[in-house]
Amino acid sequence: MTTTAVPPTSTQLCGVFADIDAAVAAAHKAFLAFSDCSLAQRRIFINAVREVASQQERLEYMATAAVEETGMGNAHHKVLKNLYAATRTPGVEDLVMEARQGDDGLTTLEYSPYGVIGAITPTTNPTETIICNTVGMLAAGNTVVFSPHPRARHLSAWLVDVLNRAMVEAGAPDNLITVITEPTPDTTKALITHPDITMLVATGGPQIVNMVLSSGKKAIGAGSGNPPAVVDETADVAKAASDIVQGASFDNNLPCTAEKEVIVVAEVLPQLMTAMTANGAQVVSDPEELAKLRSLLLDTSGTRPNT
């Protein structure tokens, strides 16, 4: 796979700012203008995001650049992740009005935006998260300030610029999404506590998720996952083996939703092991090989990735 997409030649990237205050101020100004846009206009802007983010050359560039900058993942798999984020994230079609009729008349219930959302994105899914958040949050009428993982900051700034340009070309206000150029723990704290940030969304590890959930603001946190796959005597063992191997190997097992361990009843263990091996899994039981794998994959504490 080659990086065929060319980053913008302009020295001024759209929506990219040097500090949190400037990024929030721009997103807040954009929110005021965005509030005057109709649902039909929102759909147009979001369709522009979907289109520009799902072009093959950009999919390949984002996937390859993410692996290069973060040092993590499988570029071929990231192409699919970005494509699905662009094409399958729900948009304005999910904003369904409810109507209730009774003796006192008709009541309608409609969703309203929170305002400016502070969104913290991870190193494991840097572009996928920005695309997904942009579609979903803008569909609801919000604007977004992104705080990317430091090891994905260059690609994140590039993507925010690309998406903003596509939306502006479709008639959107400037800076519907913004990002800072040099994210740090201090800038993340400043984003969380900023008075003009009305909602927080964090995709990352337990520490950052706990920070937003204890911020006192409306917050959604998606932290690290450790999903088990349970296989018992009622399972379709061949299908279970195929699904587990495919899920656990997808994007080098970076997604928090991917299978991380298998719990299996003794009765079907031999059959499952054979089927998993047939699907490309490898059995490693030699202590020396296990030690080498641990040192390759984990840091000296044995509790964190060796990045």
Give a label for each model feature.
Residues 86-90, 187-191, 295-301:
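Short, solvent-exposed polar/charged micro-motifs at secondary-structure junctions
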Residues 97-239:
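Rossmann-like NAD(P) dinucleotide-binding subdomain of oxidoreductase/dehydrogenase enzymes
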